[in-house]
């Protein structure tokens, strides 16, 4: 599935038209996660659909969802901008950024400098770079470009060998462990436990996907995660405020 998405991205990049730059201040994604509202930082995801689950939220108003997340004390937001596979839009991110005061991560499949520039222009405070989608040297180049523009970067891996190859090139500030295998789309929070021991000191560790309960939060926190990225389990609820409070057992 990842290979199919990357091929689609390569086609899309050929026709990118860069928008005007969104004139909203940059916010520190990293600092928000370093100073969370609860025992573990929460990146709450604004997501309409996914390839594995199909349509997740039929009545989808990104600004309302984002405002609910902020009211429930999420620390940062993630917005899906991929159109073909996740029914996202770049405009969703810009709209969310203009609605809330939280830092916003652009969740997409970024493989080219043009997408980094596009992310900056639509207002992203941080971008996602996927270890399984790029050679470590390519990932490092895009990482540096994003940092030079004042954006944070969440470097995501699923597999320990991918992490080891990246660490031979550089050490990211923020490292995400994707508990979902992007080849099979199966999830297991034990993936965080498995890979966390390889994460160097000084990396802010984020556990992503498959997190749906207080027990999951406590498990990944115990194994070194300082923050989590949660999407589907929050988006499926009628009230995103209640969903966050339920996740934390409040």
Curated annotation (Swiss-Prot):
Keywords: Amino-acid biosynthesis, Aromatic amino acid biosynthesis, Decarboxylase, Lyase, Tryptophan biosynthesis. It catalyses: 1-(2-carboxyphenylamino)-1-deoxy-D-ribulose 5-phosphate + H(+) = (1S,2R)-1-C-(indol-3-yl)glycerol 3-phosphate + CO2 + H2O. Signal peptide: none annotated. The keyword Transferase does not apply. It is an enzyme of class 4 (lyase). GO terms for biological process: L-tryptophan biosynthetic process. CDD domains: IGPS. GO terms for molecular function: indole-3-glycerol-phosphate synthase activity; phosphoribosylanthranilate isomerase activity. Pathway: Amino-acid biosynthesis; L-tryptophan biosynthesis; L-tryptophan from chorismate: step 4/5. Its EC number is 4.1.1.48. Belongs to the TrpC family. This is Indole-3-glycerol phosphate synthase. It comes from Bacillus velezensis (strain DSM 23117 / BGSC 10A6 / LMG 26770 / FZB42). The gene is trpC.
